[in-house]
């Protein structure tokens, strides 16, 4: 966190990997990744998975799946607060799956931090959890849907049921409760992704 020199090294490696694979477009479901690539590698075309799903269409099995689900509140992640197309496309997807939802008073470009921003939970856990509870308490809905893994987990820690939009779309057996991933699990996921990229490079 804050180590720009190490960030530049990592980001340069990412660009080399993409170049080696001949990738001209990156699709991401992570709002932090979206803004990082858009900001520091503007020559790379970055596409939000949520916008892509609107373009190509949802699986038929997902359409209207949640028309009888209890209303949820929609939390917009901080990193893409100014990305109006993503805001629009996420709401389009919610309408397509039939989910009843309400907006937070402070949403879209005025959204509030979920409590995980800037790795606050690692540096000031008490303040992070206070913000998680504050944000979660700003709706009477028991469940809060977001399109960011960290945000969904934060809403759980804040006392509500945090739900990720992709689970609502692709996981028909989802139990309406975001499972928390520990630091080790998240690290392993990143390591596995790194291994897959290396394998792709070896085959090009």
What spans do the regions from the language model cover?
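Iron-sulfur cluster-binding electron-transfer modules in prokaryotic oxidoreductases
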Residues: 1-204
């Amino acid at each position: 966190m804050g180590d720009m020199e190490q960030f530049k090294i990592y980001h340069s490696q990412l660009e080399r990997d993409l170049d080696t694979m001949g990738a001209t477009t990156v699709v991401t479901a992570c709002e932090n990744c979206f803004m990082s690539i858009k900001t520091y590698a503007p020559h790379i075309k970055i596409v939000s998975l949520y916008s892509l799903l609107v373009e190509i269409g949802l699986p038929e099995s997902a359409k209207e799946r949640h028309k009888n689900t209890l209303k949820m509140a929609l939390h917009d992640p901080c990193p893409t607060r100014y990305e109006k197309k993503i805001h629009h496309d996420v709401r389009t997807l919610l309408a397509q799956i039939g989910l009843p939802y309400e907006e937070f008073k402070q949403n879209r470009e005025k959204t509030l931090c979920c409590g995980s921003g800037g790795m606050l939970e690692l540096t000031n856990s008490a303040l992070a959890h206070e913000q998680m509870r504050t944000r979660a308490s700003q709706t009477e809905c028991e469940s809060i849907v977001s399109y960011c893994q960290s945000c969904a987990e934060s809403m759980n820690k804040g006392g509500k049921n945090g739900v990720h939009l992709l689970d609502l779309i692709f996981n028909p057996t989802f139990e309406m409760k975001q499972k928390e991933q520990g630091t080790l699990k998240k690290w392993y996921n990143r390591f596995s992704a790194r291994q897959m990229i290396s394998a792709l490079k070896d085959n090009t």
